[in-house]
Amino acid sequence: MRMYDIIQKKRDGQVLNESEIKWFVEGYASGKIPDYQMAALCMAIYFQGMNLEETAALTFAVRDSGERLDFSEIQGLRVDKHSTGGVGDKTSLVVAPIVASLGVKVAKMSGRGLGHTGGTIDKLESIKGFRTDIPVGEFKEIVNKTGIAIVGQNAELAPADKLLYALRDVTATVDSLPLIVSSIMGKKLAADDDCIVLDVKTGSGSFMKTKEKSRELAEWMVEIGKRAGKRMRALITDMDMPIGYAVGNSLEVIEAVETLKGNGPSDLTELCVILSAHILNLAEKGDLTTCEKMAREAIANGSALQKLVDMVEGQGGDSACILNTELFEKARYSCTVLAPTSGYITGVDTEGYGVASLLLGAGRNTKEDVIDMTAGLKLIKKTGDFVEEGEPIAILYSGKESGFKAAKDRLLSATRIGQTPPPETPLVLAVVE
């Protein structure tokens, strides 16, 4: 087999067979296939797509490219929740502690920032001392002891995806349905969780801009997960504006902590309660109404916050900053963005907000970039709010002043102001089982 022939075949819109897919995944993971050929194939897949059978074969090849975990030593049912990526999406930092506090084991492997979206691992690393690179044996011990751990993708786990993930990030091939499905599910299926709930984002801040594309993504992931013997569910949720008010790394951790203390933004709190309820329901803790009440109670009685403290301490982090968020490192510089005119914020290009955060240093433009954990933005006004001309709509934060102008311009160009308030959009648009 030759990589050239596989690239040509997909470039011309033909269907790749299972052996071809396994061959190029194994070849790329072992270093025999160079980046430039894999980048060409990713672009061919981006334009020509893959059918469900090809995507399932790619997913299983990614899963089988390295070690497959055995979580049988972890007592009880094991669950995972995964988001397809959004702006200001810190839900895992809230949902995982809620679920774990209610007796369901959370053994979660998360990713780093991809494109304009932030990654859970980058966010957690803004906590002083927090370790995300933990050996599998220790990971299982932590989950057994505390009921929860969130770690970075193990180097031995789906190594093909780790390489593809970094390559897609810098070659404009992130938002491809088969590449997203195989990346997410390849990793998820290499781990040994019993139940997986997927938070599939739709709208301007997601990789899937339309509800139709998001539903297709959800249906394919649920189907491939079921083929692998997992209990699956997907929620299609709105990403036409950031979740909560904070976008960035430490800024989002602080907002997640405040949510667990019962002081979070209403949209973030509601979405986290709904996601938690679906996970608990899939884990047979009760019907959805009962599970929703349990999730709210876990926030109200402080048990979910305590579970986050347990996780941070279990992974070597300084839990003092969870109990007192003033201890997080602050950005050296800030800049207030003012409304250019009066009216209602009728909508935003959420991806533009994510790009503004990137320009401030909160994400990566190349694989080697170092993230400024303090960088990002805090919204003062959101979609549906009325603003007066000259009133603050956001505050930008960064360790360098040089990114402020570009970030401010990007944020303003992504904000639409009109004279009529927009209709309200539900947080959850559909459930796929």
Regions found by a protein language model. Name each.
Residues 47-48, 93-107, 187-192, 227-228, ...:
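Alpha-helix C-terminal capping segments
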Residues 5, 10, 15-17, 68-69, ...:
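Well-ordered secondary-structure scaffolds
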Residues 109, 143, 151-154, 184, ...:
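Short beta-strand segments
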Residues 1-88, 307-314, 428, 433:
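Acidic, glycine/proline-rich low-complexity segments that act as flexible tails and inter-domain linkers
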Residues 123-149, 219-225, 229:
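A glycine-rich helix N-cap at a beta->alpha junction
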Residues 59-83, 136-166:
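Self-splicing inteins and homing endonuclease
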Residues 144-195:
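Phosphate/diphosphate-binding glycine-rich loops and adjacent basic-rich segments that engage nucleotide
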Residues 77-100, 104-116:
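Glycine/serine-rich anion-binding loops at beta->alpha junctions
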